Amino acid sequence: LEWDCWHTAEHIGDSLLSYAWQLAVQPTARYVRAVATAEKDASPAEVLEFAVTGGRILASMVRTSRAHVRAYHPAGMSDPEGFAGMGCYEALLHGNDIARGFGLSLDPPRDVCRRVLARIFPRAPGDLADVDPWSALLWAGARIELPGLPPGPNWPMHPAPRTS
């Protein structure tokens, strides 16, 4: 990752807000033409607040959007569940990037990791069935290597509804 922790947190907030905007407007061929940024003089706590705000707004949009809603994402049209999965993936992987930047580790709930991996990487190899779900998600995002598997593929996300 090339960003510092401040810019990584800003990216999380912008990504999550962008997903929320997609659900709100439901464009079919492009992203909503907007970018969210933290104020340049924001403290580290304030830029993390920006990221949390993006997550809460996305969660609200996911909860209030009907299941049939579809909106553009470069990896394919997504439903609310797909945007939720991609939002979790962004927050988890980049949250881990930030934690590592401070010499810490992130230890998310394994059930969340398992559900995110299954939802946005439905073609994940069966070799991952016995792998810790957090490690599998980090591997899928090319953050770590796993013994006996090729280097993490950094797969494109699959946001399309499960029936697609």
Label the predicted regions.
Residues L1-D4, S18-V35, E39-A42, E46-S164:
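Structured surface interface patches that mediate subunit assembly and partner/cofactor docking
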Residues D14:
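Active-site HxH/HxHxD metal-binding segment of metal-dependent hydrolases
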